[in-house]
């Protein structure tokens, strides 16, 4: 419906945004999610095969499976989901509501806005070697979507962060060989994982960097790596090359909205309120004194931001939602799966 006004519009469809959408349904708010990419999931789409250990009550789970479950949960109360739109413009109206304008020119109308944009639009740092892009359709990879495609292959990984170290550890049992190349002696990954890698069969080459790719047609067959201290060149035979040199983050026009942004993150208070009334933040995009940079912390951010939005819209509403075991919004759903429980709270929460 044109010019339809929503209670809350969540910008960003990663873990923070998805859980916030679910909780918004618990609080009986008309909700919209706007996501710039073609899929929900945010940064976790980059590592669907990595194990996630730090979500409370959830046994170790693949990133891709956690995304699937978060998306399913987010859709519990049927929020409106908009994909392939990057929010570029924000205009606050005299009545306190907002008009959000996307890259397509479409306008979205909302009483409140929750920014769960993570680190903005993310793009992989590419290998800075002329002609490298021609191999991206064959055996040059910037993420690992499926471990199995590397089984029994000779794999070279370039990078020294968490993802590079994790991929080395995960591929080591199934690949024919794994070589990791890092331009520094020290790795930026978690200490325990770096130690595990160094004690395994992974060949660690430091301080080296990739300087040339050698191919026969469209497949990389050898990689030349150079010692940063001696300029010595070595050649490594490969079946696949994985590059993890970090991510480029782009917030676009969002940085021009007048938010207090410091060191690439928006500053919020304990209620997850920004300096603009009616705009809140959740997840990696924000910082505050008690910030926890875990997926579980992003969920808490979303809850607190949503509660603040609820109270701005309905000042007399309960400060928090009733737990799902006693929330009237789950009564019908529980009955559908054969559960009967009369202890529900008949209130708007």
Swiss-Prot record:
Family, as annotated: Belongs to the ferredoxin--NADP reductase type 2 family.
Enzyme Commission number(s): 1.18.1.2
Residues that bind FAD: 35, 47, 87, 122, 284, 325
Swiss-Prot/TrEMBL cofactor(s): FAD
MF (Gene Ontology): ferredoxin-NADP+ reductase activity; flavin adenine dinucleotide binding; NADP binding
Catalytic reaction list: 2 reduced [2Fe-2S]-[ferredoxin] + NADP(+) + H(+) = 2 oxidized [2Fe-2S]-[ferredoxin] + NADPH
Protein name: Ferredoxin--NADP reductase 2
Enzyme class, spelled out: oxidoreductase
Subunit structure: Homodimer.
Entry keywords, A to Z: FAD, Flavoprotein, NADP, Oxidoreductase
Superkingdom per UniProt: Bacteria
């Amino acid at each position: 419906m044109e010019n339809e006004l929503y209670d809350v519009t969540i910008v960003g469809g990663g873990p923070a945004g998805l859980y916030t959408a679910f909780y918004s349904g618990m609080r009986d708010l008309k909700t919209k999610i706007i996501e710039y990419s073609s899929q929900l999931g945010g940064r976790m789409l980059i590592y669907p095969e990595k194990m996630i250990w730090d979500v409370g009550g959830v046994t170790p789970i693949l990133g891709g499976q956690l995304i699937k479950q978060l998306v399913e949960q987010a859709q519990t109360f049927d929020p409106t989901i908009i994909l392939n739109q990057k929010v570029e413009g924000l205009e606050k109206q005299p009545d306190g509501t907002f008009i959000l304008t996307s890259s397509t020119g479409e306008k979205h109308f909302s009483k409140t806005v929750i920014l769960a944009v993570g680190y903005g639009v993310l793009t992989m740092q590419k290998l800075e070697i002329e002609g490298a892009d021609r191999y991206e359709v064959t055996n040059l990879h910037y993420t690992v979507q499926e471990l199995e495609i590397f089984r029994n292959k000779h794999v070279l990984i370039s990078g020294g962060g968490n993802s590079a170290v994790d991929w080395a550890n995960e591929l080591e049992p199934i690949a024919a060989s794994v070589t990791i190349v890092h331009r520094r002696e020290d790795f930026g990954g978690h200490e325990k994982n770096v130690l595990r890698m160094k004690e395994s069969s992974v060949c660690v080459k430091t301080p080296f960097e990739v300087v040339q790719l050698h191919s026969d047609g469209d497949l990389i067959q050898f990689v030349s790596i150079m010692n940063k201290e001696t300029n010595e060149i070595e050649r490594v035979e490969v079946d696949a090359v994985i590059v993890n040199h970090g991510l480029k983050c782009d917030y676009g026009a969002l940085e021009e909205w007048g938010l207090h942004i410091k060191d690439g993150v928006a500053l919020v208070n304990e209620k997850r309120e920004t300096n603009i009334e009616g705009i809140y933040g959740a997840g990696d995009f924000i910082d505050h004194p008690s910030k926890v940079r875990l997926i579980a912390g992003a969920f808490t951010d979303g809850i607190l931001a949503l509660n603040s939005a609820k109270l701005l819209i309905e000042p007399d509403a309960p400060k928090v939602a009733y737990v799902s075991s006693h929330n009237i919004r789950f009564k019908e759903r529980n009955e559908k799966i054969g559960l009967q429980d009369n202890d529900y709270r008949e209130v708007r929460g």
